[in-house]
Amino acid sequence: NSPIGVLWRLDDLDIPNPNHFAIAGTTGGPVSVINNKYLSNSDFFTGAFPAEYGNATAGVFDLRMRKGNDEQYEFSGQLGFLGTELFAEGPLRADKKSSFLVSYRYSTLQLFESFNIQIGTQAVPQYQDAAFKLHFPTKNGSISVFGIGGISNIDILVSDFESAEDLELYGDSDRDQYFGTSLAAGGVSYGHRLGSKAFGKLTLAYTWQDNHADHVLVNRDSSFAITSMVPNMGYFYRDQ
């Protein structure tokens, strides 16, 4: 078995790897795009999957977004190491019990950089993500519009260093590295009760994922001066 075979699912939609700085072909990453503030439930299966998870080979992470508060408005903000985030939810029309939910997060370290606050490295991880859900009850079911998305980039530039003493622990000492990922997933779903013992659901959705990496070799002479910079490796991966 392998973590590469894990299936991620959000509101019955199979989604790409929902992590920032994810490597193409993997299912994990250092910072999750998912925020637990808008989840109602999550199930993790390691084997003996139900038939609905037919494409899974190693594991399943099934996530459910909750609907927003349909009675009153709520707003919150948070500043933490993993991100600075804003969250809002509330009724669209109180008499109809419809609701909205929206979340946004921005890299705290990137925010520090914009204020010229040094964090100990010039390779600052830059990322942001957002999510939303609109919920509309109907006579025999409901309509939901939902989506998540995230963008992340990091540049490790050893060519900016003027001496060997300036080199950091991060990355390789002989090359500039550029790495980035982005993803989006969303859709519209309609659920309808078919009598007292049956329920049907139709979902129209779209998913998109993009990963790229580039390495540039930095050649120097004995005085640490740059003599040449040579593209060494690069890849671009897109799944939609």
Can you say where each PLM-predicted feature lies in the sequence?
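Solvent-exposed coil/turn segments that connect beta secondary-structure elements
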Residues: N1-P3, D11-L13, G47, R66-G68, ...
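A beta-strand signature from Gram-negative outer-membrane beta-barrel systems
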Residues: G5, P30-S76, E85
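Short acidic/polar hinge/loop motifs at secondary-structure boundaries
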Residues: L13-F44, A130
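Short acidic, glycine/proline-rich loop/turn micro-motifs
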Residues: N19-I23, F112-I117, L157, D214-V216
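Transmembrane beta-barrel architecture of outer-membrane proteins
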Residues: G29, L39, A56-A58, Q72, ...
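Sequence/structural signature of outer-membrane beta-barrel proteins
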Residues: G68-D70, T84, L109-L111, N116, ...
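Transmembrane beta-barrel wall of Gram-negative outer-membrane proteins
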Residues: G80-Y106, I119-L157, Y178-Y206
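Flexible loop and strand-edge segments within Gram-negative outer membrane beta-barrel domains
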Residues: T121, S142-R193, W208-D239
